[in-house]
Regions:
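Conserved S/T- and glycine-rich ATP-binding loop of Class I adenylate-forming
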Residues: 34-37, 73, 122, 151, ...
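Residue-level signal for alpha-helix termini/capping positions
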Residues: 63-67, 115, 137
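Nucleotide 5′-phosphate-binding alpha/beta core
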Residues: 1-33, 39-56, 60-64, 69-70
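Gly/Ser/Thr-rich phosphate-binding loop
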Residues: 143-183
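AMP-binding/adenylate-forming
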Residues: 47-61, 72-131
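Glycine-rich helix-loop-beta junction characteristic of Rossmann-like nucleotide cofactor-binding loops
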Residues: 63-67, 91, 143
Length: 183
């Protein structure tokens, strides 16, 4: 395996913006980018086939977590250049469940939507899940009032202790959703 070539994030940065793109520009239908906080942003172009595979992989992950066509799922990642929001969004749709693209911000409204629309699952960062729990409590509501049962958390590191706290405070089962732009 040591003889197999591989591409590093630095390789992508050194060839910014499109130097290592594996498809011709005419086949690229969407572009995402990293934040660029530690160097040049990593620019990633996606073909229709890439997006189809991505959606299918996300649907499989969600299915493994117990999400079904009968679920309503809030995607509370940011939408835009960051890949998380759209990846989770299209995965939920591919599965046949209902997606609510709540994105980020206005947490009290988000909690009311979770309660009123009977949202059963959420995809967001673990830190936002903890903030949801804090806001829920400040609103005088309980985990029973909102009825979440599944959480797909990612886009930042989190610990097993954070998982336990999120599960306890929101009354759901939390799963780590893995992702990266570069593949």
């Amino acid at each position: 395996i040591v003889k197999l070539p591989f591409t590093t994030k630095q390789d992508l940065r050194d060839n910014y913006p499109y130097g290592l793109q594996a498809a011709p520009p005419s086949e690229i239908v969407r572009v995402h980018a990293s934040s660029g906080t530690t160097g040049n942003p990593t620019i990633v172009g996606y073909t229709r086939k890439d997006l189809s595979v991505w959606s299918e992989v996300m649907a499989r992950c969600l299915t493994a977590y117990g999400v079904t066509r009968d679920d309503t799922f809030s995607v509370a990642y940011g939408y835009g250049l960051f890949t998380g929001g759209l990846g989770a969004h299209y995965g939920v749709e591919n599965l046949g469940a209902t997606v609510i693209p709540t994105s980020t911000g206005n947490t009290e409204k988000h909690i009311r939507l979770i309660r009123d629309l009977k949202i059963s699952g959420i995809a967001c960062t673990p830190s936002y899940a903890l903030y949801l729990a804090e806001t829920l409590e400040k609103m005088g509501l309980t985990k029973e009032d909102i009825g979440l049962r599944i959480g797909a958390f990612g886009a930042e590191p989190w610990t097993e202790n954070m998982r336990k706290e999120i599960e306890e405070r929101l009354g759901l089962k939390g799963y780590n959703i893995y992702g990266l732009s570069e593949i």
